[in-house]
UniProtKB/Swiss-Prot annotation:
InterPro entries recorded: FAD-dep_OxRdtase, FAD/NAD-bd_sf, MnmC-like_methylTransf, SAM-dependent_MTases_sf, tRNA_MAMT_biosynth_bifunc_MnmC, tRNA_MNMC2, tRNA_S-uridine_synth_MnmC_C
Compartments where located: Cytoplasm
The protein, known as: tRNA 5-methylaminomethyl-2-thiouridine biosynthesis bifunctional protein MnmC
Catalysed reactions, as listed in the record: 5-aminomethyl-2-thiouridine(34) in tRNA + S-adenosyl-L-methionine = 5-methylaminomethyl-2-thiouridine(34) in tRNA + S-adenosyl-L-homocysteine + H(+)
Main location: cytoplasm
Amino acid sequence: MTDRIVPATLVFREDGTVVSPLYGDIYHSAAGALAQADHVFIRGNGLPERWRHERAFTIIETGFGTGCNFLATWAAWRADPSHCERLHFVSVEKHPFAREDLRRAAAHIVAYTTITTITPIAPLVDELANAWPALTPGVHRLEFDDGRVTLTLVFGDALDVLPNLALRAHAFYLDGFAPSKNADLWSPAIFKSLAKLADERATFATYTSSGAVKRALDEAGFAYRKVDGFAGKRAMLVGEFAPRWRVRRHEPPRAFSTDRRDAIVIGAGLAGCAVVERLAARGWHVTLIERRERIASEASGNPAGVFHPMIARDDNLAARLSRAGFLHALHRWRALERAGHAFSRSTHGLVQLATSDDEFERMRESIDALGVPAELASALSRDDARALLRTDVAHGGWLFAQGGSISPATLAAAQCAAAGDRLSRIVGVEIARLERGGDGRWRALDASGATIAQASVVVVANAADAARIAGLRHAPTQRVRGQLTLLPPGSAPAVPLPVIGDGYVVPLANGVTLTGATYEPDDTDATPREAGHRENLERLERLLPAFSANALDAGALAGRVGFRCVASDRLPLVGELGDEAAAAREAAALTGARLRDVPRATGLYGAFGYGSRGLVWAALGAELIAAQIDGEPWPLERELAEAIDPARFLVRALRHGRVA
């Protein structure tokens, strides 16, 4: 991948401490990892007292290691009856442990702890290990205690990933290996990156008191002081963010300011229902408005859709976004299922077949070169694909062990059910435009000008109509017709799991097979056509040679038409919308603007342009919007968030002098 992850090696010393052979240093003191975490990092940052005054509290750690600092902090949060509503723990790790090594290391440390905690920590170890993500570069968000404790893991070199984070930190745990063993993690560049993320009242703590670290802290705007170290160590450092000069051009993100936590979501498809669930989980009261009589009636009403990540040899933006979206969606869906909100999905994997032998070689070489873990994707020879699919195939491909198919409508229903009584629905009503009143609240108006609903926040998630309703001129999207075909039982090879390539085939209940889909830009015909069925049959024949397209009467087949919303750069539009009117007034000053310089339509967000990847992108997009609204750490790198920022087209227009 961008920089493949090299896992840590688990080694125990005779005294029971965990040691890194790579750095030649221990992960924790022989006097006890949990006691060290409590003394140095929790107490060193004035916790738990400080988080009692915040709705949400964010901690950044440099070096996740065995996870003991997180486990100790989580246990302290659980034990505090006055704890903050939501605890965010963000940790950067260049060499994460594999799942079972992490479980062994943390369990060993807990078993030999020298302190007694109110909250048992051993069960937390299992929860952490069970949720542990695939070792792929980037951001991985895990949730515990019904989402009230969030662990955001960032796998990669801190020098590279810290400047790419978007969050506001209240406390820093500086916990790399000793400066003499891993100087990069204590360099001035690290502290300058942390300073750009610090809240005005942020604190830090670290076990070291080296002169180089003190100088780097001072240069970055942190005031430090020495205090007694842990287990007889003479000194450690604690302190506050207290810059004597301006150290950053842009302030870190803040929560949307409002006295009323209510929101409107327009569009009840995959995008909108995912946003509903994420906002409701944070205590927002949401009004969902859908122009049809029921949710998931348009493209999200297809019998099934496939979900899998993209893999590209250059690990481009689209591939990274799809990987992040895929892994995040799996995490969210499992959480829904654990909460009793079931929906229909296959869990036996998905196969992507090459269209030629040369393409198969490129596919195989890609996952080898990128170091893709087998739990994400593995190469599948032609013979292996034949055996797995129980039918002939022309070429090998990839097996996505966690990919599959899903019923979008059942997922949307589960997300709405999870929102519970925080959700109100208005169906059969079409919104014509949005208007922000003098009180700062948004109103959703119908064609007659009547107010259908009002709220502090609005999220437009109604595909190709979103830009029109939000009044956007610089959000180029296109409607693309897609026709799928339903094949009767016994008329197609009975593959046991979804297959994609040039088209797709999905086994449904009762022996019915779904195949498709056509791709017809700017075609608005919602009626299935014989020509579309014929195209799908021919595509299926190329995918599975045992099938004959001529064996069926295309004119007698059933099917369905949906419309994708596709942006001109094929990436979705997710996040706070730009204020185009304000940008026009300031156009002369914004010709060289970056996305963070663009004026925003306060309280107005978008989640649209997902194309054919709504299942992969909707959950991550919803989490990003909820995080932006509540001022939480973003669930993906800033570079990726900017790639899908709805205002990116406005910035391009400003640079070319096309905004007036």
